[in-house]
Every structure is written in structure tokens, then in C-alpha cells.
């Protein structure tokens, strides 16, 4: 196990903890025991955080990001802690969205979508959706513990990815808190909506002005250098943004948030497409003469 040396909170950390306790409604955990509990996930790593915040709502996240930014620290969003690569541990402030921000907000069975908070566990969402014959498509092995926010961060998929693809293929909208504490909704925007947003002097406006320009500038590199595979969780999804622009579809930055591992903002709410639960399933054992022959049989 890779581990950091245990350390008592510094005076600056103590000051940060006191300010967090004074400004948010959720829990602020800073004891050695709490820090040790949150120093691990399903990976081999052990890294003690400065402290842990369990926000009760988006307002708590806004306050936390503003205070953490003022103290020149980092934020580590955390859901179910099922990461195998250490994405939910770090030396900054761990933001545990699974404790309170775990509700299913709205489910529309007719239009087949669901609004959930980022800490909602996939199995819980699927249990509710199953009453209407629906479910979330991608099915990672950690479904019983994985949070939707974690699935967004990791661009999760599962054993049936050939049928359902990645979670990026099912995201309709994401609410995100950016580093400056601003709350934005990344969903399909009409040209008029984009024009209205970009008139303002805000971080959101800068993103909508500069990212399309950046993608256009490096369009050829994105086309030629991104892997020509459909199951890819490496890097930022600039290729998906480029495809939106080339198709002339309503522009959204949601594909860029998916797979970003919490580095671009903290996801608070997600609108997901739902799929029908198969009425029948079966298992087939198919024999091939070689590994290459079996790979060639897989649809691309």
C-alpha cells in the first residue's frame, strides 16, 4: 500500500476547518480517525486529507470551494469510494457527496430520463427506475456502491458496453460548481442562449467563448491523435465536443465534464437518459480458433 506519513493538522488547516464549520450546514470532519477513514478508497493508495466536508446542498459546496480556494488548497470530490486508481484520495479537502446529496430528484418514465444528485448510488436509482421497466445503461461492477457523480467523473461503462456505451452517451445535463464558486448548468444551448451567456464577464462566459475557439484551433490534432476507439476514458473529451460542433447540434460542455475526474468542477446534479430493462437475457458460449479471430468478431 502506498501511504503518506501521518501528520497532525497545521495551523492553516485548523483555520480552514474553523471557517468551514462556521459557514456550511453539513459536516466538517478533521479528527485523525476521520482523516484516516477517508485516506483510502478501493485502490492501493493511502493519502491523508487536510479534512473532510460532507455538504448538505449546493450552497455548502459553493462555500467550501471559495474557502478552500482562498487557502490555496485542493478539492477531491468523492462518491462511493470505489475507485481502483486513487481518484478519490488526496492531500486536499475531500468532498463527500454520498452522505447527504444522494437523492433521486425527478424521474420521467415517459421521456426516459432521471434527475439525481451526484451522491446518488446507481443501484438505488435503478431500483426506482425498475418500477417503470427502466435503468441506467452502463453497468459497472461496482453498481451497488458507485455514485452517479463518480460514474460521471470516471466516464463509467460496464460488461454490456457494446450495447450501452459509456455514461457520456447518456448524460443530458450536469450542474457544476466551478472553482470560483459559480454554479452553472451544462446542457444543450441554442445559439441565442449562447450569445446571451457570452455577453457577461463571468467564468461561465469565458468557457463558452474560449473552449469552442480552442477546439477549432486544434481540430485536426483532435481528429488525428485521439484514439479511434469508442471505449476510451483517457483525457478530456474534446473529441466529443468537436463532433457536436461539426454536426451543428445544440452546444453543451457536458461531454467535457464527463471523464474529467473532478478536475474541472464539482458535479452536483445530473440528468441521465434511461434505457429499457431487457425482457429476456441469455448467455452464449462462442468458440474461436484464435484470439485474433475472436477480436475480429467484435463490432466496431
Model features per residue range: what roles?
Residues 1-70, 80-114, 141, 263-281:
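N-terminal flexible segment immediately upstream of the FAD-binding catalytic core
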Residues 72-73, 133:
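Cytochrome P450 catalytic domain signature, combining two hallmark sequence patches
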Residues 103-107, 116-298:
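FAD-binding subdomain of flavoenzyme oxidoreductases
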